[in-house]
Amino acid sequence: MKKILLITIIIAILMCACVNKNDDNNKEQPPKAPEVEEIDPLKEQIEKMSIDEKIGQLVMVGLDGYELDDSALDMIDKYKVGGFILFKRNIQSAAQTLELINSLKEANEENKIPLFIAVDEEGGSVSRMPEEFIKLPTSRAVGKVNSEEFAFEIGNVIGEQIKSLGFNMNFAPVLDI
């Protein structure tokens, strides 16, 4: 009896082993395309920079006067600063401001990363824009109107004004407490 039971178990195991399963695991998978590592050009550019260049990119400086001077050139050439912020003391007219910003960008052409050229243009009493530009209401006055569309349009006007001079960063709006 034991012999028959043992033979039956062996036959059952062999029969189960011979069954052809038709599931997804047995299907032949199409060959996968080789994975191509995506190259991030920004990461690649940063890896090529020296430590001094990386540190310089963290610094934004102001400058004196209405024109590019030796001190500003030194900041660009020697220290590879990340950008400049212009204040009212740097802005006389639209033409002069455009000339200053273009000369900063031109002086930076040899560097790997373009400069941030910033301004703090909030509207109202905090305005750095030349006299030729539209004077805009304060953020408080814009808020009192209580209109998202109006606030959006004021923001667009500020953006277009500073963009027309070559600025690429604005430190506004802010919430002063």
Positions of PLM-derived features:
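C-terminal motif of bacterial Sec signal peptides marking the signal peptidase cleavage site
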Residues: 14-17
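Positively charged n-region of N-terminal signal peptides that target proteins for export
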Residues: 1-4, 8-9
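N-terminal, intrinsically disordered, polar/charged segments of Gram-positive cell-envelope systems
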Residues: 20-49, 54-56
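Domain-core and long-helix interface of multi-subunit machines
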Residues: 61-62, 67, 72
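C-terminal non-catalytic regions of proteins with extracellular/luminal or membrane-system context
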Residues: 2, 19-20
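Structural motif corresponding to alpha-helix initiation and N-cap regions
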Residues: 39, 69-70, 98
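Enzymes and membrane/adaptor proteins characterized by extended Gly/Ser/Thr/Asp/Glu-rich
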Residues: 75-177
